[in-house]
């Protein structure tokens, strides 16, 4: 038997993503599903595509988007086939997932959701987890050599923290998403610092004496 499910077009696919998968914009804090269990299980189902290329992980409050875009641009200019995953998007969901500056094709988004619909529903993936897995998978299919991956929220429990990067970057920390990440700079810094991994170099933005100790 099994399911018969056919997505007709890109717009319907987006409708599914934004409605069936809880989005932070719509639901607020309850949409924030910290933890790596679901994304780990789903990426395993995909064959762990995120392990097939080098990654650079970027977290922080201020400037992480700009830093991510600059890094991708520099890598591309240096001749590397480069993936870039950022959020949120301005006009089109596909702005989040770029290879050498080009957005993921609409058909790739449709095919991915159609193919993995059952598993995503079963695992109860959040909108961001789904987007992250799509990026990981598309970068692998596109034979990228290196991908710049920006965290969605925080770092420690962020879906992107599944990757083992060649370097982690933490830009300046500020008070944002305090209800989710903590209400003081050190607490937020601790969440962002969650992307730091043993034996992986880290580059940090402006040093702040308050975080020493």
Regions found by a protein language model. Name each.
Residues 1-2:
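Residue-identity detector for glycine
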Residues 55, 145-146, 201:
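Residue-level preference for the first positions of well-ordered beta-strands
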């Amino acid at each position: 038997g099994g399911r018969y499910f056919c997505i007709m077009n890109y717009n319907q696919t987006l409708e599914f993503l934004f409605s069936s998968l809880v989005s932070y914009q719509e639901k607020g804090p309850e949409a924030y599903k910290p933890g790596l269990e679901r994304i780990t299980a789903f990426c395993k189902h995909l064959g762990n595509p995120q392990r097939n290329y080098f990654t650079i992980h970027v977290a922080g409050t201020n400037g992480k988007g700009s830093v991510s875009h600059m890094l991708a641009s520099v890598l591309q200019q240096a001749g590397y086939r480069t993936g870039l995953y950022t959020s949120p998007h301005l006009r089109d969901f596909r702005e989040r997932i770029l290879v050498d500056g080009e957005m993921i094709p609409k058909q790739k988004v449709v095919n991915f959701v159609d193919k993995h619909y059952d598993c995503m529903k079963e695992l109860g993936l959040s909108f961001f987890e789904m987007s992250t897995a799509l990026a990981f998978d598309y970068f692998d299919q596109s034979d990228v050599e290196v991908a710049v991956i920006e965290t969605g929220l925080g770092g420690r429990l962020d879906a992107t923290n599944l990757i083992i990067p060649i370097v982690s970057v933490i830009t300046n920390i500020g008070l944002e998403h305090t209800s989710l990440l903590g209400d003081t700079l050190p607490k937020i810094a601790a969440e962002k610092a969650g992307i730091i991994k043993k034996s992986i170099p880290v580059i940090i933005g402006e040093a702040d004496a308050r975080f020493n100790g």
